[in-house]
């Protein structure tokens, strides 16, 4: 069984006091069996068109960018088989992978900019 840590965090950015953004990761810990699908949920709030990112941090390593959304296609493909779908109507940017591997055990961070 794999344990994917998704820190419960809410990040709020205020730029000039008029444009506030926040992101909320809904799961604090996600456990999956190797070979099964992974879903890491992220919802955001933004007063304008956001740029959204998913980062991963493996034990004793620095942050690594998995993928980013910057207003192009709604389905974003990242590294190592991860992808995320931007759903403006649901204000979500959930990270998915069809088949988890032991090497995916790490902390994952959703960021809005």
UniProtKB/Swiss-Prot annotation:
Main localization of the protein described in the UniProt heading: membrane
Disulphide bridges, residue numbers: 42-110
PROSITE patterns recorded: IG_LIKE
Signal peptide: 1-20
Keyword Disulfide bond among UniProt keywords: yes
Subunit structure: Alpha-beta TR is a heterodimer composed of an alpha and beta chain; disulfide-linked. The alpha-beta TR is associated with the transmembrane signaling CD3 coreceptor proteins to form the TR-CD3 (TcR or TCR). The assembly of alpha-beta TR heterodimers with CD3 occurs in the endoplasmic reticulum where a single alpha-beta TR heterodimer associates with one CD3D-CD3E heterodimer, one CD3G-CD3E heterodimer and one CD247 homodimer forming a stable octameric structure. CD3D-CD3E and CD3G-CD3E heterodimers preferentially associate with TR alpha and TR beta chains, respectively.
GO CC term (a single one): T cell receptor complex
Short name of one Pfam family: V-set
Record key words, sorted: Adaptive immunity, Cell membrane, Disulfide bond, Glycoprotein, Immunity, Immunoglobulin domain, Membrane, Receptor, Signal, T cell receptor
Entry's localization field: Cell membrane
GO biological process, one term: adaptive immune response
Its job: V region of the variable domain of T cell receptor (TR) alpha chain that participates in the antigen recognition. Alpha-beta T cell receptors are antigen specific receptors which are essential to the immune response and are present on the cell surface of T lymphocytes. Recognize peptide-major histocompatibility (MH) (pMH) complexes that are displayed by antigen presenting cells (APC), a prerequisite for efficient T cell adaptive immunity against pathogens.
This protein's name: T cell receptor alpha variable 8-2
Coiled-coil intervals, chain numbering: none
Residue ranges of domain Ig-like in the record: 21-113
Record: glycosylation sites: 43
InterPro entries: Ig-like_dom (IPR007110), Ig-like_dom_sf (IPR036179), Ig-like_fold (IPR013783), Ig_V-set (IPR013106), TCR_variable_region (IPR051287)
């Amino acid at each position: 069984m794999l344990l994917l840590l998704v820190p419960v965090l809410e990040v709020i950015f205020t730029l000039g006091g008029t444009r506030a953004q926040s992101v909320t990761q809904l799961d604090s810990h996600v456990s999956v069996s190797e070979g099964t699908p992974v879903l890491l949920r992220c919802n955001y709030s933004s007063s304008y068109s956001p740029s959204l990112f998913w980062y991963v941090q493996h034990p004793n390593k620095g942050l690594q960018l998995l993928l980013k959304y910057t207003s192009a296609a709604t389905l974003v493909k990242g590294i190592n088989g991860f992808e995320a779908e931007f759903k403006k109507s649901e204000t979500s940017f959930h990270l998915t992978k069809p088949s988890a591997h032991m090497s995916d055990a790490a902390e994952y961070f959703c960021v809005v900019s």
